[in-house]
């Protein structure tokens, strides 16, 4: 019997640059967008993402930069949401920058909220083109000093990384 492997989960990462007068609105979206996102047809998994200042490795938050990572039932579902949803239209009204990356995962490690949102992954290994690396970690309080000790070197390495978008 011939078995066709399931298609990789279509994934989007949208970054928002909140405009100056809408900082409080942007912060509020971390809570108020959740019920709206739970109602989006074809949306399988989502995470609202905050960011740190500078290259992102800062204890100080960047209240102007947020992200929305989603996995979808289909590319068509993602396109409808990105182009026509009231929530995305609301974001457009409160931002001066919106950028969406559309991706197919080819590797995943670990779980987000007990789920593996990027499986299944591509059956064929990645051979060419851009690669995005999404990382997520919870750091134990006792491990924080060790983590922060490596931040300067990591940030410096990012300064020299070809193709880095910050």
Predicted regions, residues:
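A common structural junction motif
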Residues: 86-95
């Amino acid at each position: 019997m011939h078995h066709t492997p399931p298609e990789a989960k279509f994934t989007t990462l949208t970054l928002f640059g909140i405009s100056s007068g809408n900082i409080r609105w942007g912060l509020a979206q971390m809570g108020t967008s959740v019920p709206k996102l739970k109602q989006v047809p074809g949306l399988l998994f989502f995470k609202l993402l905050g960011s740190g200042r500078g290259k992102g490795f800062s204890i100080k938050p960047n209240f102007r930069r947020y992200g929305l990572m989603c996995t979808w039932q289909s590319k068509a579902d993602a396109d409808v949401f990105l182009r026509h949803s009231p929530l995305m239209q609301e974001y457009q009204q409160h931002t001066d920058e919106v950028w969406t990356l559309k991706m197919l995962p080819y590797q995943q490690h670990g779980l987000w909220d007990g789920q593996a949102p990027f499986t299944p992954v591509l059956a064929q290994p990645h051979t060419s083109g851009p690669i995005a690396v999404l990382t997520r970690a919870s750091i134990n309080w006792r491990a924080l000093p060790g983590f922060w000790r490596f931040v300067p070197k990591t940030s410096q390495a990012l300064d020299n990384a070809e193709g880095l978008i910050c």
